Amino acid sequence: MSCLPALDKFLQNYHQSYLSTLGELPRYYPQGEPSLCIQGEFDESSDEAVSWLPVKREQLGSFANVEHALELTLWRDINHFYGEYFAAPVLFDSPWGTGELLQVWNEADFDALQQNIIGHLMMKQKLKQPATWFIGLLDEGDKMLTVDNANGSVWVEIPGELPSAQLAPSVAEFIESLSPRIAPPVKHEELPMPALEHPGIFASFKRMWHNLIGKR
């Protein structure tokens, strides 16, 4: 079962929840990065938050280059989860706590995502662990949400460790268990992680790594 219908529904409910509760669209700090998602005027020099809506990509994002580079077939949901939309990260409440689903802000963000998924998968190979790829963060960035590449199930994972708990048998069922979380935009502190400099998806991963390192 594709995760796309569940993702479509969640993104629709997400924006409707903001409109119903706050009377406005969700906002996001783009840190100078343009996106088709932005509603209204955009000033690259401004550090203000922007209102945004998810935008369907004209051409589906593909991970064929990642598969070719690693000689690995990725679980099919990766193309629908990351390749259908341009969007900001979306916040959620769940039976397992609060968290954030990652999305792609623009084409440069998609390129950065691919490179970091390659890095994550190479780390798993080096550690002789089963392949996973990430879809979000849990508990304010303390843990990753990852997909088992062998069967599409969703797990909690701390970088460098084996996944610790299965949350759902599929990405679709995981998304269906979430509800939108209404919160003001947060401007994430820039942290010294050169490999994760792009402000779209990976501001979230900077925060996660910062939290993990700080707790060791």
Curated annotation (Swiss-Prot):
CDD domains in UniProt:
Syd (cd16323)
- Cell compartment(s), UniProt: Cell inner membrane
A single GO CC term for this protein reads: cytoplasmic side of plasma membrane
State one Pfam family annotation. Answer: Syd
What keywords are annotated for this sequence in UniProt? Answer: Cell inner membrane, Cell membrane, Membrane
What the entry lists under InterPro entries is as follows:
Syd, Syd_sf
Q: Is Lipid metabolism one of the keywords?
A: no
Its record classes its membrane topology as: Peripheral membrane protein
Q: Does the keyword Coiled coil apply?
A: no
Annotated family: Belongs to the Syd family.
Report the NCBIfam families cross-referenced here.
Answer: PRK04968.1
Q: What's this protein's function?
A: Interacts with the SecY protein in vivo. May bind preferentially to an uncomplexed state of SecY, thus functioning either as a chelating agent for excess SecY in the cell or as a regulatory factor that negatively controls the translocase function.
| Protein name as it appears in the record | Protein Syd
